[in-house]
């Protein structure tokens, strides 16, 4: 779970206790009648993770009544939804590693990984049914955006489309949308004022974009498995990222070999090593960090409309923790 050192002691104690409750609920709810399904679905749960999304739900609930029993369920719903998409993403990307452990598709094959993702969506839906029709509607709208974002990424930009703008749109739909749902659930299920909920949703979508852009930087810059994935994973898969798209925009004569490698998946490990070294020394990496901080700062500014209290300070700390991952 992400550490927020600047939280007030009171907010930190409360958040830690409720996050522990989410963790127990998440692990228990993944269980089913078929032991193998329980094993595969708990694979990534047990691997850990930052738990940004349920944490965001819990923090948002502090603007209303955070003791309502639906809040913990909502936090588990968003994390189960996120986990399900990871199983599916790893199949599409043929990723061997997730959260520092062997991916489900690598261990059990694509069919089991896909079905495990479906299973987690089903388990999420069971909880969602207890949250009311509005919660179901917003989950469906968010899921539509997630899928459309994935389709957009798979299809790629058309003709003269701005490749960077297309990518930011993909990130908004795939990552920003679920962050927004987290805040919406925490806000409106706790009975927060509608204007507060709206502000929290907009803040969280912007935060979600910054979160993914930070991951793009980490994929290039980390020398270890900082992101839980093998460094250079996106390069191996030929997936465009903020850093590689900026290299295209800021290309220099000496980048000819790098640009050739970035035009598709990089299969040779020697070429991956070369590309990572070239990207780490390219001015595009610094620009990617600047853009990431710009989105995080945009999210921070939205918090000016919220009451200045321990929870708002916690959301500010979340922004700082996110940016520090890529700085």
Predicted regions and their residues:
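All-alpha prenyltransferase/terpene-synthase fold signal
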Residues: 1-327
